[in-house]
């Protein structure tokens, strides 16, 4: 099986320095189980080679770098290269970390190649993809003969980094097969992310239905047992109704 892994660069949440994207490292772990030598592919600037070597340190010999200036659309370069170098499976992380991590690149690539896409994969074995679903559920899908798969951030990080491998690995710089085009976000105005509202924490471990039922249940108490004759009971009831202003004094 020929496997190509699309690699991006993340950004450290504290220092802001470029780093490997953890979700792409998860994709490499899955690719390593499917084939001994998957193809590693990145589109970006050649000046980021030192950061890209972090991927080679996970146990890979070569990484293909399609040189593209900053701010150019990478999808066209990826689609053109993958058309010239077809493979059975294209893997990518669900999204990058701290960069322009919209997660749309795999979808655009799949559309450009006319392939199906399976998202949020946890593992791949025997032609089946285990997909992560909300609330911790899982779903097993039969994988098409050719497709694009995005790897969930819930997939395990199983590869270990070795500095010697990072130094010995080779980065092959390729020229883009298509002319670069301006990215869609070139005219956008970037602003710092605003902190969202803090979510309320649920203090009880009971389910929503249990909490709702508890609110709806009315407790007894405060009632009065009427004793005596019918006339006395009727007078007492009328008195209570007047106190509650449910009955006018004239009546």
Spans of features found by a protein language model:
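Short Gly/Thr/Asp-enriched flexible loops that form oxyanion-binding sites at enzyme active sites
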Residues: 98-117
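Metallocofactor- and cofactor-centric catalytic cores in central/energy metabolism, strongly enriched
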Residues: 42-45, 223-224
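A glycine-rich helix N-cap at a beta->alpha junction
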Residues: 49-82
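Gly/Ser/Thr-rich loops at beta-strand to alpha-helix junctions
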Residues: 45-47, 95-102
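Conserved acidic residues
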Residues: 61, 88, 146
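Glycine-rich phosphate-binding loop signature in dinucleotide/nucleotide-binding domains
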Residues: 82-89
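N-terminal beta-strand-loop-alpha-helix module at the start
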Residues: 1-43
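Electrostatically charged, flexible surface regions
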Residues: 123-250
């Amino acid at each position: 099986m020929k496997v190509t892994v699309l690699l991006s660069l993340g950004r450290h949440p504290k220092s802001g320095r470029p780093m490997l994207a953890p979700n792409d490292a998860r994709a490499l772990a899955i690719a390593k189980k499917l084939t001994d030598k998957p193809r590693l592919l990145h589109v970006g600037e050649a000046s980021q080679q030192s950061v890209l070597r972090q991927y080679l340190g996970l146990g890979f010999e070569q990484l293909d770098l399609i040189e593209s200036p900053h701010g150019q659309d990478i999808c066209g370069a990826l689609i053109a290269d993958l058309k010239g170098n077809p493979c059975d499976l294209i893997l990518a992380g669900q999204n990058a970390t701290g960069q322009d991590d919209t997660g749309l690149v795999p979808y655009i690539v799949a559309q450009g190649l006319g392939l199906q896409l399976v998202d949020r994969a946890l593992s791949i074995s025997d032609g089946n993809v285990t997909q992560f679903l909300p609330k911790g559920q899982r779903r097993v899908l039969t994988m098409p003969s050719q497709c694009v798969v995005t790897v969930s951030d819930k997939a395990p990080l199983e590869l270990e980094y070795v500095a010697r491998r990072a130094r010995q690995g080779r980065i092959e710089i390729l020229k883009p097969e298509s002319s670069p085009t301006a990215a869609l976000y070139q005219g956008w105005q970037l602003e710092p992310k605003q902190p969202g509202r803090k979510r309320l924490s649920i203090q009880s471990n009971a389910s929503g239905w249990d909490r709702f039922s508890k609110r709806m249940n009315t407790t007894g108490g405060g009632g009065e047992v009427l004793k005596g004759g019918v006339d006395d009971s009727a007078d007492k009831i009328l008195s209570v109704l007047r106190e509650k202003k449910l009955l006018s004094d004239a009546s």
